[in-house]
Amino acid sequence: MEPLSKAKQKWIRSLQLKKNRDLESLFVVEGEKSVLEGLSVFAVHLEMLVSLETFVEQIPHQFHTVTFTVTAKELEQISELKTPNKCLAVFRRPETALLTDRFTIVLDGIQDPGNMGTILRLADWFGVKQLVCSKDTVDCYNPKVIQSSMGAIYRIPVHYTDLVTYLEQTPQPKFAAMLNGKPYKEVVYPENGILIMGNEGKGVRPEILDLTDIPVTIPRFGEAESLNVATATAILLAEMIQ
């Protein structure tokens, strides 16, 4: 182990920008729990670790060769968190193939990192093996997404693509969440279905709805105007995956 150089500090800070994460195919994870989980299930993709000296003893010995130490002030300067934890890790992004004929969540223009992270966590809970997203959906490697995914980012592959082309090319049955669809409990769902969730304010785009087999809705019994997209995703997944 050695102290983290100024150059490496600057480099880690640069990964706060999506364009730099994309360019280097890397992402940053912060916080003791998330980092240690990554070392357990994602170690093959580890690029480097940064730790306070007081936390080093909790890092497994085999990772010490790629561990750099920092002061609390230095960690604060390279951290995205308002209150930095004791360590962070830089991981390489895995290369994963797009799965066919498997249940898939499609996200059309989701913008809020918290929603994206929660949907990743839901996918992990319900055993969904991938997310497919429009190119304008929030970056899954956004630090706030990673924090709210609670480790799901390590297990759920996320693909960004042109959704019209993707949906045109897959024969899987497609179900889009919307306000004026068929009540979701009246629908029979196949094991290989696609659940399409739309933008928080605008919903699913018309060109995507045109490629949908059945629009589904969660009936409203109260006065709320709409449901949070992550909440709606949870309700629909609980029905679709039995």
Residue ranges and their predicted role:
Residues 124-126, 137-154, 206-242:
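Structured adenosyl-cofactor binding patch, chiefly the S-adenosyl-L-methionine
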Residues 62-73, 102, 172-174, 188-194, ...:
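Active-site regions of enzymes building and remodeling cell-envelope glycoconjugates
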Residues 176-224:
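Active-site/ligand-binding-proximal alpha/beta "capping" segment
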Residues 95-181:
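RNA substrate-binding interface of SAM-dependent RNA methyltransferases
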Residues 1-2, 68-71, 156-164:
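Short acidic-hydrophobic, aromatic-tinged amphipathic segments that line or gate anion-handling sites
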Residues 1-54, 137-138:
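Boundary-proximal intrinsically disordered activation/regulatory segments immediately upstream
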Residues 67-92:
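Glycine/small-residue-rich loop that forms an oxyanion/phosphate-binding "nest" at active or ligand-binding sites
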Residues 33-35, 55-56, 74, 137-138, ...:
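Alpha-helix capping/helix-boundary segments
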